[in-house]
Amino acid sequence: MRDCAGKLLARGEPFDVVIANAGVMATPFGHTADGFETQFGTNHLGHFVLVNRIVSLIREGGRLINLSSLGHRYSNVDLDDPNFEWVPYDPWIAYGRSKTANILFAVAFDRRHRDQGVRAAAVHPGVIQAELARHVDASQIQKLIEQRNQQLTA
């Protein structure tokens, strides 16, 4: 992301909209090249670094859109243990942490930049068939649907 941001800054072309959409879901335990848990690093920290480095390129009236997920309901962000060093790794908790971080980032970004005419939002894109779910099998998805239905009818 740092290299990408550097190239964008060197070009100097402004943006009307930045959509932070890179992501992974329910991955096996692993780390990014920078040593962060894969989902938190990919889904949140990558966006955070890129956007904060190129914020000067977002025009007045521009927008930042963070693709989050209803999966944010699985977990709050745990900044005391973002890499699962003290608790067992759970891919859905990790996903939830990253998606909660997307939302919190959008809220904080909006607060910091709205007076300059730049706004931010986090959105749930809906359920779609995509490579995002490549680490999830059908039984896991069915279990999630059943859990959600139980919550909605309780």
Outline where the language-model segments fall.
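Rossmann-fold NAD(P)H-dependent dehydrogenase/reductase core
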Residues: 1-136
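C-terminal helical subdomain
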Residues: 98, 122, 145-154
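A short C-terminal helix-loop "cap" of Rossmann-like NAD(P)-dependent dehydrogenase/epimerase domains
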Residues: 85-86, 139-151
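Secondary-structure junction/capping motif
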Residues: 37, 90, 142, 151-154
